[in-house]
Every structure is written in structure tokens, then in C-alpha cells.
Amino acid sequence: MSWLLTRFMLCALILIAQIIGKPDLAPSAWVRRLVTLFDRAPATPFDTVQLVLKKELGQSVGEIFENFEAEPLGSASIAQVHRARLKGDKSDVVVKVQHPGIQELMMTDIRNLQAFALYMQKTDIKFDLYSVTKEIEKQIGYEFDFVREANAMERIRRFLYENNKKSPVLVPRVLKDMVTRRVLVMEYIDGIPILNLGDEIAKRGINPGSKIAMTAKQNILKSMTLAYGQMILKSGFFHADPHPGNILICKGSEVALLDYGQVKDLPDSLRLGYANLVLAMADNDPIRVSESYRELGIDTLSKCENELQELLKFAQTLFDTKLPPGVVMLQPFSEDSLIKKIAVQAFPEELFSVLRTVHLLRGLSVGLGINYSCAEQWRPIAEEALYLAGRLKGTDLKPRVRKCRLFRRLLGRE
């Protein structure tokens, strides 16, 4: 059982890596090392995997699969995935298998994280970190139920495919009769991990700064941004874990989004409140930012003279992919840190998933070498969401949003 002991020691490290292993939160040298942990956790031995599959699916590996690769494609903190092919089928599938005993280990790590959060709140960092760890506890708790994950994957797949002529991202199809709490079988999507994109570009002899390379990167970011704008602002139900290990780049710069263990279903009040904050950030409107904070239930206490401008800067630091002028990296311990200037006394637990998602998108944009504002890109979706909720008049919409609505009416879609 030495593999289980090794896993116990590494679980906390992997959690930390996935939280801070982004270019805007840590030096690049750290990031290069931390991101390797996204899908390289210790693997469960194959004989144990076979026992889990037999118990969960009721048949042995040989009875179900034509072939089954013993070496996993990747192993993360909760599960590992294997490539396989079902008997009588010509298409490959991915089999996700939960590590035995991992739930108890992970929840122990979370409790330790909560104790650390309570300690940190006694320092100069006046941020409601404990609420954040409570949301992490809830979200990670959901990840141990693969039936829930399969339902989430199907719901998001249906939403994106039905609301777009072509879905901005690929979502694997679930094999519904091969899902249990600990095993999930889904469609195999061929692609390269986004972490290997730079190597793939170099292998093809393409200059990373060339027009063709930058166009490919822009298309990748455009796809991710559109998908997340629609999920968060239009649906409220979204994939909440877009770290590099969950993103594949497919033929033609198409993007596949994997692993739906962490999803979030925002209540309409928070979805529309965040839509209002998106418009405030896109317009650099400090008064609207302050109003949005109150609507979202973010309780702040400012320790600076220029309160409204600092609140705007704080919002853009937390909830936009483009950092405001003068902010290069989040540095909570520096003397001029925004977290020290603005004490966050209350922060809605459910909003943490939005914050984390935006920060992961920011890390993606920095890694691709593209500085952009998701708030500006999401403006049309936010305006439409508020309009449909009766909170904006047609005359308040930007011209491109009015034009999109006109097209939908002509096509009979509303």
C-alpha cells in the first residue's frame, strides 16, 4: 500500500499546485513545475483498477473491452483515465476510475486547508478565506460522484450544442449505461494537452510569434472565452475547473474541455449580479462596481482615500482576466496589496467558483501570451442576460447586441 501513502502526502501538494500554478499568481519557474502535477498524480496499480471495474460494472475488463491500456493517459488527485475500446465497437473510449480510499484523504486535506485559512485571516490579509475553503470542500465533495459528473457533462454538452451553430468547445459524449459513482466511460477525443502546444508548434517548425501561431492561440482563447461566457452568464451552470490538464487542442485549433467533476449552478440572483459586475468592469464604472458588490453580497471595508477607484481595481483583479494598470501579479503579502487596502468581510461561497474560473482563464491567456479582458468579451452576453431578465431596456444595449437580437427574431428563435 505504499502507493496509497505516497498519494496521501501528495494530495495537499496537488491541491496547492492547482490553486497557485498559474502565471499570474506565481513566478514562471514555479508555474512550469507546478502545472506538471495537474495530471501526474500517483497512479493506482492496474490490478487494483481491474478490481474496481469488476465491482462497479459487474464484469471483468476482458469481458467488456476489446482492449484496455494498462498505462493511464493521466492520473489526477481523484481519478485516473485509461484509453480502451469496447467489444463490438470501432471507436475508442476513455475510462475514468476513482482511486480507492481517496475521498477520506482529500477531505482530511480540506480540513487542514480550512485551519490554515482561519490562521491567515488573523494576518494583514483581510479576506474571507474560510468561506472560500467551505466552497472548495463542497465542490470537491461532489467530485467523488461520477453519476453526478456524467449528468453535468450531458447538461453542459446539450446547452452548448443547442445554443450555437457549432459548439465553441467539444464536450465528450457519455456512455450512459457505463456510469457508476466510481467509474465513468465516455467518448475518446483525440488531441494534445494544451501544456504541449508550444512543443507541438516548435515540432512543426513554426515560429511561436508568427501570425499562424498567434492566430491559432487566439482561436483557442476565443473558443474558451465564448464557452465560459455563455455557461456562466446565460446558463449559470458551468464547468468550474479549466486548468491546463483539462484542456485538449484538437485538429483545426478546436478545443475540447474535459473533466466535469467540478461544476457550479449559480442561482439567478448571482448570475445576474455577476452580469452587472461584468458590465461595470468593461465600462470602468466604479459606481456600478460598488452597486454590484452589494448585489452580490460582497461586503468590503476600504482603508484608502480613493475608495471607488480602488474597488474598481479590486474587481478587475478578482473577476477579469486583464489585470488593471499597475498590477502585474497578485501579491497578497506586499505592502500595497489591494487585499490589505480593501478588507473583504463577507464573500459568497458560491461566487468562489466564478473567481477561480476567471483566474484559470487568466492563467491560460498569460500562458498563450495574449493579454485580453474577458469582461469586455462577455459584455454582449451579460447585456443579453440582463435584458432577458428585464433589467435592461433595448435602448441600453450596445449596437452589436441589438443586432444579434434582431437576427434571432428574424430566425424565429425568440
Question: Where are the language model's segments positioned?
Answer:
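Hydrophobic residue at the +6 position relative to the catalytic HRD Asp in the kinase catalytic loop
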Residues: G245-I249
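Broad phosphate/nucleotide-binding scaffolds in NTP-utilizing and phosphate-metabolizing enzymes
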Residues: M1-M231, G236, C250-E254, Y260-D268, ...
